[in-house]
Amino acid sequence: MLHNAGLTLSDGTTLDDLINRDMNEVSLRVMNDKELYELEMERVFARTWLLLGHESEIPKAGDYVMRDMAEDNVIVSRDRSGEIHVMLNVCPHRGMKVCTAEAGNAHAHRCIYHGWAFRADGSFIGAPIEKEQMHGNKRSKDEMGLKKARVHLYGGLIFATWNKDLSFEDYLGDAKFYLDQLFCRTDNGLEMLGPPQRFVLPCNWKIPGEQSGSDGFHTLTLHRSLMEGGIMGGTAESIYDTAPGMYGVDLSVPQGHTLRCLEAAQTFKMFADVSFEGKSTEERLHLLPPPGITKELIPQLFKNLSEDQVKQLANIPPQVGGMFPNILIAFIFAPRTDGGASGALSLHTYVPKGPDKVEFVNFIFAEKDAPEDVKRDMLQNAIWSTGTSGTIEQDDADTWPQIMRNSRGHMSKTVTLKYQALHGHERPEGWVGGGDLYPGFTKDDTQWAWWMAYYNLMAEA
């Protein structure tokens, strides 16, 4: 039996009691345990890279937004030189919030408690009555700044971490080949379409978190209304009518990132009765452009991506998935009837707010160089589908809290979650990208890979 002694709770329960790697089962208790949650804050959220927003939210010097790295509130700001900083929103004097506004523009942030002031890069300016030196003489002013996280911009997305050692390249791993196709494909990249949508759900962050590990199977049942409306190409009479759309190549990497790559030809059949057979890469891209890409932007794909990446976008593009630990990726095809570009580009983050509470944050994007009518169309599509009251998220927002309620019961905690429908690794012929690959019908492989990434971090003391 596989065993790791890296974590033992106060009642003697070990990590291996909670996550059975031999049976591919996870105890329902993990969704409702305060002690485990506190360890997650230290071992998962303080050790990995977290998505906070996009640089288009703070275009000018002094612009800032407030975000959360798990339960730590941070200021995301741009200084006079244009550099972006992420600072803990805790005054080192008495622990008060330095910034209390959700967003704004300020070249200095002043704590309302005792007036300590800090620059946009987090460095300490001083306290009122400078001659009295109210910061004392035990520490230099250079030591009095706000605690700073490391920052990395990826396709304009703002990531931050408290971990001094983990590089962003190591965090992405082999997933970069695929994620570049979504975030780094045009000259000027993506931009956010307004501030993110946010709402709080009464559930543990891991419930939506593990679903973001490319759980495609739940779509057939939970999101049946999409079929009833003819949106997914199936019919209400039989969920199996949509099964062909569930076939593709799922993939995972050891870091816990997962993606579902679906045949563009199969997707195209849902919208038009035209064959992809014999079409070149460029012809396929013109028939079914990636979500948000206009025909005028297609040449930029060849400029910014490798030949292999462009071929994948044309043939079997990544569409949905997740970045560990708490990001959902949704790049949804929705071609317009006039042949124009459209779709929906959304990223969700599931921010922990306690063992039984999560903040759902929905970031909506479009290509910066897309026409305004395309941006409006994509904003509407994203709100309608993956928005806080969208057709998809209404279903999820009802299901996740019910799992949470079940996790509180004495007997319910003895139930284990099953991840035993496994395909196993198999590399399709001619596949170029890295990672562990699972071709065929979507199964449990990628979600189990998510749990293994979680297990490995939690096992490290």
Regions found by a protein language model. Give the residues of each.
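C-terminal catalytic domain of Rieske-type non-heme iron oxygenases
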Residues: S77, E83, N89, A149-A461
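Rieske [2Fe-2S] iron-sulfur-binding domain
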Residues: E57-F177
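Generic alpha-helix structural propensity
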Residues: M31-E35, R47, M69, V86, ...
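A short, Trp-centered hydrophobic/proline-enriched beta-strand micro-motif
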Residues: R47-G53, H223
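Short N-terminal helix-initiation segments at or just after the protein's N-terminus
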Residues: S10-N20, M96-A103, L285-L297
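Generic structural signal for secondary-structure transition and capping sites
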Residues: F45-W49, M96, F217
